[in-house]
Amino acid sequence: MAPGITSIDPSSLKGLLAEHQDICTLELTAVTGLEEVAAEECQEKLGVNCVIARGRVFIDIHVQQVPEVFKLRSIDNVNVILQMVTNFSFPDNREQCFQQLYKFAEKPDWRKGMSVWKNVFSFSEEPIQEVKALNNDYCKPRPDIDLKRMKLTSQIIDNIPEGILPQHLKKKWQPEEEQTNAEINSIVTDTTVESEEDSSEKQRVQASGPKFRISCNRTGTNHNFGSSEAARQFGGAVNEMFGWPVDLSCFELEILLYIDTEFVYVGVCLTREPLFKRNLTNFGRTNLRSTICYNMVRLAAPQPGEVIVDPLCGGATIPMEGSLTYSKVLHLGGDNFGQAVKRSRDNIDYLVKKGKSMPIDVAQWDAARLPLRNQCVDIIVSDLPFGKRIGSKGDNRVLYYNSLLEMARITRTGTGRAVLLTHDRNSMMRNIKRVHTLWKSATSRTINIGGLSAVIYILHRTALLFDPNLKIASKTHKKPSEPGTMWPEYLAARPPLST
């Protein structure tokens, strides 16, 4: 697993040094567990050195080369880093913390970062027209507004003085249902009045330039302030220095403030939306991120002339990403659900209309009875059902077993390989052991998908030929007609497949 963000040495990043004005430091966010794959792509396509942290890859690149970064297929977001501090000591006094965050806005190299942002988004005006000195005073704290979304489970509630906690946080041990309607209405009314006062103060300040907002991500248990409070102080200083208008919803510029214990860095977001949404027009319930799809295909190391199949393709995100990158490889996908096949065709047609030429095709089939010849496929890349939104773990035990056998039948012996993603580790490991004569487990990677801990398994096909009459014995054998049978004998009632 990649090291944490606090292990990074800012001196190793040239883009953060004042003497390198033509080089900038970019933060490329990646799926946790696939940072090394993203770094390999950066080194291969950009020729840059990478510094890996958990969920991130930092690179130094020439300012003129920044547009090339958006062509990478393994990253989700791109941010330009302006300042990074490893020992940002926060005092115990809240007001001193606010003062520190307020003055910290003077430290970043705003001109370099905003120059990169302007070129990426083709902003017509000069973002920084005048820089005003700060008044050396932090903004008025508004804990009743900034902390109203803090949950009772937050780890820093005990660090905040009880006198300034909002009403819903003071009643830490009282169930939320026990609050009276009058109490709830008073909280809403007070918040509304203060929000109107806050907005009237903003209207009195004449602002020009890009509309911006501050997004603060804070990690740690030793802080005595919330993320919104830190964003208010830092954003107030930015507004005071440059006179940019604040807009939390229809913003043009998003400034990122990351706080991890005493590790703090500031960045500017260079992506309007995550890059994993760029190739899909028809989304399903379980669409896999296109960046994960690319990484899985890359792990399979396809060679020109090979055939890649996804027997449970869903919206065809894996075949699409593979065909866009590996154009000399044939990509096939299929699913048992008719609506999924329709979504697949819609997504493919959308890319074809954009002028993309892709060696890809999709069909409706059963993953346990594929209409393909023996040993006609080189690689299997598939996102198996997790058993969460679709199916169940009980179904997975049977589906995984039958699918692994069918995959073994259609893949080439000795050279075939499979890259399979699943959240149901127990079912997968149990079935890999049952088909160990056909599949050899090479390695696995644990990744984070929306808070779920999933695993990518890389399997290699053994040299053993697939026998249609082969029966893999299980430890506990039950007849298929018995209730509770979880391991029916494969191919027992199935006619032999012709080659």
What are these regions (language model features)?
Residues 2-247, 496-498:
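Non-catalytic nucleic-acid substrate-recognition regions in nucleic-acid-modifying enzymes
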Residues 57, 263-264:
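Hydrophobic residues embedded in beta-strands of well-ordered beta-sheets
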Residues 64-72, 273-276, 465-467:
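Short, charged/polar, Gly/Pro-enriched secondary-structure boundary elements
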Residues 264-301:
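SAM-dependent Rossmann-like transferase core, predominantly class I methyltransferases
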Residues 278-279, 422-499:
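Class I S-adenosyl-L-methionine
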Residues 288-375, 379, 388:
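Conserved S-adenosyl-L-methionine
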Residues 340, 350-451:
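S-adenosylmethionine
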